Amino acid sequence: MILRGCTMALERYNVSQPKRQAERGENTADPALAAGRACSTAELVARRLGIAAVQPVYRFLDTWWRKGCWSGEITRLTAVRSACGADAARGGVLVRRGRAADGHYSVSCRRGVCAQLPRTGWPFELLRLAMEGNSRGAPAGGTCTVLP
């Protein structure tokens, strides 16, 4: 009976531990991601989430700005879109800096870094999208810049 209770507690721990780590923002998803650099366009994020428009991706990031998660060279996410040109779905990229950098993810565009996001607020699904975007390269007509 005691062994059965311990086994059940261990099973609950094994299921809930990754969930707790994800909630705290710990990077346990992919060791290759931690060692390398990755980027993804808003277009790839929208496609992976199964939505036809890119606008909800920008609304999601804009919500982070309103919650105070953004820091960097701009004051609003809309400035990222305007700085990146008319077609930010192709020109703007979500970039993760290398391990030796300052521990921030960046929104980059053709003109350079537009904003930064702390590591702890980055959802694991978007990290997977970043890996996918990096492996596919830039979409037609776009740029996929990985910052040093």
Swiss-Prot record:
Keywords: Conjugation, Mobility protein, Plasmid. It comes from the Bacteria. This protein is essential to promote the specific transfer of the plasmid in the presence of conjugative plasmids. This is Mobilization protein MobB. It comes from Escherichia coli.
